[in-house]
Amino acid sequence: MKAKNISYLIACMLMFCSLNTQAQNVFPYPALPDTLRSVEQRATYLSEHYWDNYQFADTTQLKNEEITEQGFVNFIDILARFNDEIAQKGISAFTAKAYAQKPAKEKFESLIEHYFDDPQSPMRNDRVYSFFLAEMKKSPYFDEAEKERIDFKWKAARKNLPGTMATNLSFKLEDGKMHQLSDYQNEKVILYFYDPECENCHKVTAWLKKQTIPAEYRMLRIIADDQISATYSIKAMPTIYLLDKGNIVVLKDCTPELLISVINNN
């Protein structure tokens, strides 16, 4: 299930979600108080109160994809547009309610894994995913074995997030020579991790060759061996990163379409 067409302007999204619809097959969005004037105030309120009208104990509602899954998809879609503080507040409020009953816990664990951990998901976002995992680690509704598994995923999700310096690594390019990522700190870099035998890699490579990539960007095509895959938590091939000068991560594990959009609109 994909996110519905929600405006990229946060203000418009807030107006949409503030409609307190009474339709039976629509997620019960909260009504935003008229006293909240600034976009930040409205975003914070929406984030914290998004699930106020949702009945986590109602198993019939829980099984309704148009309500539960679509509501969750829209939730994580807007969280990705909020800053860390606002997103974390929303996830904390969600966590306090979502896992108290076993059916809801199982349902939302499944949705979180599907939309954030599946390499084919178009909504992957390790920044937001790490916030969910951090709250799950603190929740009393997960046992120690579950928390150990969650902690492993949290550590992987926190690696090389946008805004941080990419982990240095040694790699061999097509010239047969060994290189260090740190050798390219003065350049804008596209890291293209691939497997020579990966059919999807061939398709993406062919597509990228048809695109316009500005001369200021250097593409490093790196065969992802086991060590590199572990260092960068690579889940599928190809995996693409965009780095600014200083090896600062701009995009982590992005789609080729997003890569081209960003580098041609900067």
Residue ranges and their predicted role:
Residues 177-206:
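Short active-site neighborhood of thiol/selenol oxidoreductases, capturing the structured segment around
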Residues 215-227:
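Thiol-based oxidoreductase modules, predominantly thioredoxin-like and allied folds used
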Residues 200-214, 256:
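Typically the conserved alpha-helix immediately C-terminal to a functionally engaged Cys/Sec
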Residues 1-26:
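Bacterial Sec-dependent N-terminal signal peptides
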Residues 23-168, 173:
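Oxidative protein folding and maturation machinery
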Residues 245-266:
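Non-catalytic, surface beta->alpha helical segment in thiol-disulfide oxidoreductase systems
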Residues 232-241:
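Structural micro-motif
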Residues 173, 243-244:
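Short, acidic, Ser/Thr-enriched surface-loop or helix-capping motifs
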